[in-house]
Structures are given as structure tokens and as C-alpha cells.
Curated annotation (Swiss-Prot):
Entry protein name: Large ribosomal subunit protein bL28
Gene responsible for this protein: rpmB
The family this protein is said to belong to: Belongs to the bacterial ribosomal protein bL28 family.
Biological process terms in GO annotation: translation
Keywords, ordered alphabetically: Ribonucleoprotein, Ribosomal protein
Natural source organism: Exiguobacterium sp. (strain ATCC BAA-1283 / AT1b)
Length: 62
């Protein structure tokens, strides 16, 4: 399963590293996701949730 936020849909983004000579190499920026248990349809479920969603109170841990 991809490390994508279950609540906000945030997923890793891609781009380039740029050196002083402006060479470019591919890289990715990951999302700060944590595996937590939350209530989904009244039942506990383990899902990946972003730290931003946890801090802002979008989900309640079980």
C-alpha cells in the first residue's frame, strides 16, 4: 500500500535536486504519515494518516 494519507489524500511529490552547477537528479519529498487506528464506519481500522491531519483534529485515534 502506498504511503498516502487516508484523510487528506496527501502523497509523495517528485522534483529535482539542483547542484551549484545546476545538474539535476530526480528526488521525492515524502509525506509525514503515521500508521494509526481510527474509526471508519464505526469500526476501528489501521490506516496511514498525515501528521497535519492528526494535529488539526481531523481524525480521532481509537
Amino acid at each position: 500500500m502506498a504511503r498516502k494519507c487516508y484523510v487528506t489524500g496527501k502523497s509523495p511529490k517528485s522534483g529535482n535536486n539542483r547542484s551549484h552547477a545546476l545538474n539535476k537528479t530526480k528526488r521525492t519529498w515524502g509525506v509525514n504519515v503515521q500508521k494509526v487506528r481510527i474509526l471508519v464506519d464505526g469500526k476501528p481500522k489501521r490506516v496511514w494518516v498525515s501528521a497535519r491531519a492528526l494535529k488539526s483534529g481531523l481524525v480521532e485515534r481509537v
